[in-house]
């Protein structure tokens, strides 16, 4: 009898072990369908496209770019950028490649973003957002079917170069001139998003502009000192950002029921500003200067062979790696916020929710302006994640 009981216990133990070891491990991205990630915009999302459009030696292809990953990879960071982390969370098993480079695996998406990209004008050795969308259309038939495109995520960050160039060329622009320019930029953004939607895309992630006046390169060029931002550029960014949510609400509201327009808006402006103003909460010890560069804010010349730029000892203590772009540590934070944060950060849903939301159903929620209560909540937090 005892032998039978021992055998039974042994069988149960074996069964328990097999059950435990065969149970799927819970990881970020579990239950996320096999969809793609497509990125559009400027150097913040450029995965290596810029080097295909110029014969000039580019700083992001030289050390110390890629320092945290041991090798420059054409990205404007010491390592990975936010879309790289987002792709991991979406369980995409390959790195999202630069679409303009030959012989790359675009089976799960591609980056069409190019450094120096704008919405308006004709950027030198770069592409406007409209040109990036048209490039996607050229590649679509040979690489992605309609169902894959409809269920994939299309992520856009664009406009910073438009406002930086405008401010340099129009230093004395009055309020009405500024407002007219913001309207021109956002109208063009709406048209380009509509073009992408007409190409079959249905799930959009729009990242608001950063507080451009707080970028180290802007502080340095406009001599703001170490503790001040250039508020004229911040005001332009805020005017731009205020138009994004209502614009996307309208696109979703007017889309036919047979082809829903789904979106979310990532509040990148406040994600940066919060880390600038309460840097200790996020273990950033320098937020007003760059890890790599020269000048009053170490904001110029990182990666240029003919510039003897300074390199910080520990890049993870910095919010910015160069004069305009964030460190890998910050990029990973933004990836987490994009994928899983609440509506104080990204609304009306995060990307995890957007991906699993049925592609054939209209959105039940819309973007709403942040309230004073939301602002007070942000300001009252201690060691917060946002």
Swiss-Prot record:
Glycans are attached at residues 105, 165, 288. Expressed mainly in roots. The active site is at 43 (nucleophile), 322, 325. InterPro entries: GDSL, GLIP1-5/GLL25, SGNH_hydro_sf, SGNH_plant_lipase-like. Residues 1-29 form the signal peptide. It is found in: Endoplasmic reticulum. It comes from the Eukaryota. GO terms for cellular component: endoplasmic reticulum; nucleus; plant-type vacuole; plasmodesma; vacuole. Coiled coil: none annotated. Pfam families: Lipase_GDSL. Keywords: Endoplasmic reticulum, Glycoprotein, Signal. CDD domains: SGNH_plant_lipase_like (cd01837). GO terms for molecular function: hydrolase activity, acting on ester bonds. Belongs to the 'GDSL' lipolytic enzyme family. Part of the PYK10 complex. Interacts with MVP1. Involved in the control of the PYK10 complex size and possibly substrate specificity. May be exported from the endoplasmic reticulum upon interaction with MVP1. This is Inactive GDSL esterase/lipase-like protein 23. It comes from Arabidopsis thaliana.
């Amino acid at each position: 009898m005892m032998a039978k009981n021992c055998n039974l216990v042994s069988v149960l133990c074996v069964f328990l072990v097999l059950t435990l070891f065969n149970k799927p491990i819970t990881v970020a991205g579990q239950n996320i369908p096999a969809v793609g990630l497509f990125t559009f915009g400027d150097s913040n999302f450029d995965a290596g496209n810029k080097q295909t459009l110029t014969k000039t030696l580019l700083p992001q292809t030289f050390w110390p770019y890629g320092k945290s990953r041991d090798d420059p990879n054409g990205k404007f960071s010491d390592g990975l950028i936010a879309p790289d982390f987002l792709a991991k969370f979406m369980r995409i098993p390959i790195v999202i490649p630069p679409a303009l480079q030959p012989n790359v695996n675009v089976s799960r998406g591609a980056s069409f973003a190019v450094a120096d990209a704008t919405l308006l004008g004709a950027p030198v050795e770069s592409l406007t957002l409209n040109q990036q969308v048209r490039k996607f259309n050229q590649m679509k038939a040979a690489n992605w079917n309609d169902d894959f495109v409809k269920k994939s995520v299309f992520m856009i960050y664009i406009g910073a170069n438009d406002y930086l160039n405008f401010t340099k060329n129009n230093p004395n622009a009055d309020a009405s001139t500024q407002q007219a320019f913001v309207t021109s930029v956002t109208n063009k953004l709406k048209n380009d998003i509509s073009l992408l939607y007409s190409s079959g895309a249905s799930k959009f992630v729009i990242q608001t502009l950063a507080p451009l006046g707080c970028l180290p390169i802007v502080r340095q060029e406009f001599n703001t000192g170490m503790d001040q931002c250039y508020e004229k550029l911040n005001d332009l960014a805020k005017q731009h950002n205020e138009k994004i949510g209502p614009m996307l609400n309208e696109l979703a509201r007017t889309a036919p029921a047979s082809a829903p327009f789904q979106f979310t808006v990532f509040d990148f402006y406040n994600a940066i500003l919060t880390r600038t103003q309460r840097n200790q909460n996020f273990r950033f010890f320098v937020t007003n200067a760059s890890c790599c560069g020269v000048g009053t804010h170490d904001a110029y010349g990182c990666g240029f062979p003919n510039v003897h730029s300074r390199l910080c000892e520990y890049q993870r203590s910095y919010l910015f790696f160069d004069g305009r772009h964030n460190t890998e540590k910050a990029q990973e934070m933004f990836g987490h916020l994009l994928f899983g944060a609440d509506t104080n950060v990204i609304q009306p849903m995060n990307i995890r929710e957007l991906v699993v939301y049925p592609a054939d159903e209209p959105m039940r929620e819309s973007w709403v302006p942040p309230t004073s209560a939301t602002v007070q909540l942000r300001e009252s937090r201690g060691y917060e994640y946002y």
